[in-house]
Amino acid sequence: MDVDDRRRLVSEAAWRVLTRDGLTELSVRKVAAEAGLPPSSLRYTFPTQASVRDAAVSLLVDRLNTRVAQARHAAPDSSGARAILLELLPLDAERRSEMEVTVSFIALSMTDASLRPAHDKAHNAVRGICAQALELIGAEPTQVQLTHAVVDGLALHLLGQAIGSPAGWAIQALDAHLEQLHAHRSDPR
């Protein structure tokens, strides 16, 4: 197994531990067991718990970017903006898991500064994705922060709902936000 294969294997194992057991239970030993590797074999590629955590966050960002690229390719016009932003909402099990992990990083980074870089990486990725979406509709760059706040707020509310609860209201709210951006662009006053 080459280094890239090992990194991928360990990153995916770390992701499974994160989603199953939570951030506070993530350890080199647990990830090694999940990957079916002896802990000593991770010594060079993932020497610390922080490096394992960073690999899991990188995997999250990579998966998100892949889905966003697919959405953008499928709809390279203004409808792509909606498709891209919908990828940021926990509307299925995969996106719900991603959001649960992200929220745990937010909460725990408030008291553990070592978690801040991982949180910042995920936060900046979402901000960048919002910028990509708004670029498709010709919205002003100043609207990125507002859109990021809207998407984060909708995502948190969806996460707080019981699994399987209707999510149509959040999609309608996102559509209303995009309509307001379009109206603002048409009539900037």
Where would I find each of the regions flagged by the language model?
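N-terminal intrinsically disordered/low-complexity leader segments
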Residues: 1-5, 185-189
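Helix-turn-helix
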Residues: 6-9, 13-51, 55
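Solvent-exposed, amphipathic alpha-helical segments
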Residues: 9, 13-21, 67-70, 105, ...
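Hydrophobic alpha-helical connector segments
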Residues: 55, 66-99, 143-147
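Short, basic, alpha-helical segments at the C-terminal edge of helix-turn-helix-like DNA-binding modules
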Residues: 58-64
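Amphipathic alpha-helical packing segments from all-alpha helical-bundle domains
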Residues: 65, 94-103, 111-137, 145, ...
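Amphipathic C-terminal alpha-helical segment
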Residues: 91, 108-111, 148-167, 179-185
